[in-house]
C-alpha cells in the first residue's frame, strides 16, 4: 500500500537496529560476560540472570547503556555469590563503556534512502528513539546521518503518551505521521494505537524485553529492505 493518498507530513525513524546495528554489540558483551563468569555459572544462567536483573531495574534505571552496565555488574555479583574480583568488575565496566563507542555504521540502504527522502523535500524527517540522551546523540553524530533530520527526540519509554506528545510537538496529527522501526513493541504497536501509519522493518536480533506478539493492521506495512520505504512514500 502506498501512502500517496494520505496527508503524510512527518516520517519518524527509530534509531537502534533501524538506522544502525546495536543489539548485536550488546549480545557480544553478554557473551563475554558469560566467559568471565564461567567458574561460577553457565552462559545460559548468566543470560537468564541478566534478563531478570534488567527487568527488575527497568522502573528505576530505564533503558540504555548505563542501565545495562549496572545490571551487568549486579548480575555478576549475584552469579558469583559475592566472590567476584575487582579485576572482573573493572572488565565488566569497560565492556559497558565500549557500548558507548562502537561504530554506528548505517545499515544497508539506510543512507541512500534517507538522502532520497531528504532531497525529495515533501516529508519532514525526524528521529524518535528510546534510551539515554547523550548516548543517542553521540550515536547519531557518529553515524553521519544527522544532517538528514530536522529533529531528534530521545525518551525513556515509547508508549502512546510519548507518540501523542511527539505529534503535538511537531504540530501534526497522528494520521499525518509515519513511524519506521524494527521493534513491534516500541515502534509499531503504540504508534498504531494513537492513529499513526507505521512501517515495520524487523532486525535479525531482538532484545528479549522488546519481544511481543505481532498482528496485522490497516495502517501497518512490513518490509524487508530499507529502500522499500521509497516506494511506499512514492519517492523516485
What are these regions (language model features)?
Residues 39, 48-98:
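A metal-dependent, Asp-based hydrolase signature
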Residues 2-49:
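Active-site neighborhood of HAD-like aspartate-dependent phosphohydrolases
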Residues 103, 125-126, 137:
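N-terminal cap/leader regions of alpha/beta-hydrolase-fold enzymes
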Residues 93-112:
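Long amphipathic N-terminal alpha/beta scaffold segment
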Residues 32, 36, 40, 113-122:
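A short, Lys/Arg-enriched amphipathic alpha-helix followed by its capping loop at the start of a domain
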Residues 1-8, 111, 115, 119, ...:
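Asp-based, Mg2+/Mn2+-dependent phosphohydrolase catalytic module
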Amino acid at each position: 500500500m502506498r501512502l500517496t493518498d494520505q496527508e503524510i507530513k512527518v516520517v519518524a525513524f527509530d534509531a537502534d537496529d533501524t538506522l544502525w546495528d546495536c543489539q548485536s554489540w550488546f549480545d557480544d558483551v553478554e557473551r563475554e560476560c558469560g566467559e568471565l563468569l564461567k567458574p561460577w555459572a553457565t552462559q545460559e544462567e548468566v543470560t537468564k540472570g541478566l534478563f531478570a536483573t534488567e527487568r527488575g531495574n527497568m522502573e528505576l534505571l530505564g533503558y540504555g547503556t548505563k542501565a545495562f552496565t549496572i545490571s551487568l555488574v549486579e548480575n555478576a555479583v549475584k552469579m558469583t555469590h559475592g566472590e567476584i574480583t575487582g579485576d572482573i568488575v573493572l572488565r565488566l565496566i569497560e565492556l559497558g563503556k565500549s557500548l558507548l563507542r562502537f561504530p554506528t555504521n548505517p545499515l544497508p540502504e539506510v543512507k541512500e534512502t534517507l538522502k532520497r527522502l531528504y532531497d525529495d523535500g515533501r516529508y519532514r524527517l525526524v528521529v524518535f528513539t528510546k534510551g539515554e540522551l547523550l548516548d543517542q546523540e553521540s550515536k547519531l553524530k557518529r553515524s553521519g546521518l544527522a544532517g538528514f533530520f530536522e529533529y531528534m527526540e530521545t525518551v525513556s519509554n515509547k508508549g502512546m503518551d510519548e507518540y501523542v506528545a511527539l505529534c503535538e510537538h511537531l504540530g501534526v496529527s497522528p494520521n499525518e505521521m509515519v513511524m519506521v522501526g524494527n521493534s513491534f513493541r516500541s515502534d509499531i504497536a503504540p504508534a498504531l494505537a494513537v492513529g499513526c501509519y507505521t512501517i515495520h522493518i524487523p532486525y535479525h536480533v531482538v532484545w528479549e524485553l522488546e519481544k511481543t506478539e505481532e498482528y496485522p493492521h490497516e495502517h501497518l506495512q512490513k518490509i524487508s529492505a530499507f529502500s522499500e520505504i521509497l516506494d511506499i512514500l512514492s519517492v523516485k
